Amino acid sequence: VHDRAASTFQISSAQACVRQVQRLLQRIERRFAMRQIELDVGGEIVPFYRVADPDKVLDDVAREADLRQRLDGRRCADEPVHLPYWAEFWESGAALVAALAEGSIVENAPGLSVLDLGCGMGTAGAGAIVLGHRVMLADVVADALLFAQLNGVLAAKHTGQAPTARTRRVNWCTDCLSERFDLILGADVLYDKTQWAALERFWLAHLAPGGVVLLAEPGRQSGDVFIDWLSGRPWSLQIDKQRIPGREQPIRLLRLKTA
C-alpha cells in the first residue's frame, strides 16, 4: 500500500509539474522569444529557458520608457526604469552553480536555506534546487521571475521534488523578508556602487547565524573597488576563482561571512 501511495504521488506530482510548465511557457511566449539550453549542475544536465534576444528586451524597455516620458512630459523620479539586465544569461550565475556543485567554497550539505538575490532568470537558484537546497528566487523585475519560476520548476522536476518554486519580488533597497537564509547568492550584483550600502544592509538583515554571502563577478573594476570598500566593514572575505566551460578567464568568487 505504501509503495502504491508513493507511486500515485509521484505520478500526480509529475502531471502537476507538466501542467505548471505548460502554463508558464504560454505566459512567457506571449511576450518573449526564448530558447532552451542545458544547465550543467555537477554533471546533472537540466533544461533551462533563457531570453533568445536580450538586446530586443533592452530596446523594448527603452522604447516604453521614452513613450511614457513623452506622454507624461517627464519621467517621475520615484518610478525608476529597471534596465533588463535580468534578460542576459550571465556567466557569473553558471560559476555559482559550479562552485556549489563542487562544494569547494560552501559546504554542499543538502537542505540549506538559499536566497538567489537578483536572480534574473534563475541560473544560480535552479542549480541550488538541483543540489537539494530550499531556495527562494528573488528579483525586482516581475518578468525575470516568470523565467525564474519556470526554471525553478524544471529543476525541482529533475530531482523529483514537488513541482513548486518559491519566487518573490524583492527590492533590496526597501524590502524586508520574514526569514533568514544560510546562503545568499548574488551573480553580477556589484555593478552599481550606489547599491552596495543597501545590499549590505539587506545581507545583514537576512543572513542566518553562521550564514554566507557568495558573490560572483567577472573581474570588473567595480569588483576591485568593492573589495576595497569592504575593508574595515564587519565581514571576513575569501576570494576564489571559478572556471567555467567556454570562458578563458575565470569568474571571481567572493565569500563573505560576518566577522
Annotate each PLM feature.
Residues 2-259:
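S-adenosylmethionine-dependent methyltransferases
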